[in-house]
Design a protein with these regions (language model features):
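A short alpha-helical cap/connector motif
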Residues: 2-161, 168-189, 193-242
Length: 242
């Protein structure tokens, strides 16, 4: 018997690109970077020298087989948190502490990050990362539970920044909750917005890519957002709520 998620994914495969075979404005012939493009990407990734704390956290995450954002993504997260002077932020998916370190490094001095992840081990690792970086423990609030059970209980309109970086198959649901949580002028960040650079390939119909396409289309159709799609790391979707 097909689950609701499987039926939904099958509908996306049948319908998502029937007319154009791609997202509007994306040319599949131009989606694969040349060698010069790759060199430019690598240069931009390394432009901001990562801190020792980031290097240690990133290396530890990879050694443990845990996901970790690139140095360019980390630098962008710090920059964006500083840009909006974030006092209160939520991250969906703890990412072994690398994203938490990046966000808290840019947030206001007493800013608090709430991190929601179903895996307690990820959050324990994150606490160790932040301890080594000498970030106060009261600035990092962890909730080890299914984000879709937790997010509806958080106060709407109370957060300056929300990072989506959890289960890719839940991105559409995360997106809805993230927009509810943001204050007016708050910033939404969605990691892996280019689906590990598979997004522009119309032949790629894997589950993660289909859901990320759907999430991006939802953002495009949502009024009251100012958006940008940035090819840093594996892609960041940025959206400011009116």
């Amino acid at each position: 018997m097909l689950t609701a998620r499987t039926r939904h994914l099958n509908r996306l495969r049948r319908c998502a690109f029937e007319d154009t075979g791609r997202l509007e404005g994306v040319n599949p012939q131009e989606s694969r970077p040349s060698q010069l493009d790759i060199a430019s990407w690598e240069y931009s990734e390394d432009f901001v020298a990562p801190s020792e704390a980031f290097r240690n956290a990133h290396a530890a995450a990879l050694e443990d087989g845990l996901p970790a954002v690139t140095s360019g993504t980390a630098a962008m997260l710090t920059f964006l948190a500083r840009l909006v002077s974030a006092q209160a932020a939520v991250e969906i998916g703890t990412d072994a502490g690398v994203t938490a370190l990046s966000l808290l490094s840019g947030m206001a001095q007493r800013g608090v990050l709430t991190s929601v992840d179903p895996e307690a081990f990820h959050q324990e690792t994150a606490r160790e990362v932040l301890k080594e970086a000498q970030i106060a423990t009261n600035r990092f609030r962890t909730i080890a539970s299914n984000p879709l059970d937790v997010l509806p209980k958080l106060r709407g309109g109370a957060y300056d920044l929300v990072l989506i970086n959890g289960d890719r198959l839940e991105y559409v649901e995360y997106l809805s909750q993230a927009l509810r949580l943001l204050r007016s002028g708050g910033l939404l960040i969605m990691n892996d917005a280019l689906a590990s650079y598979h997004l522009a390939d119309p032949d790629n119909q894997d589950d993660d890519t289909l859901i990320i396409r759907e999430a991006l289309e939802s953002v495009q159709q949502t009024e009251g957002l100012t958006t940008s799609l940035v090819p840093v790391g594996v892609g960041l979707l940025l959206a400011v709520k009116d």
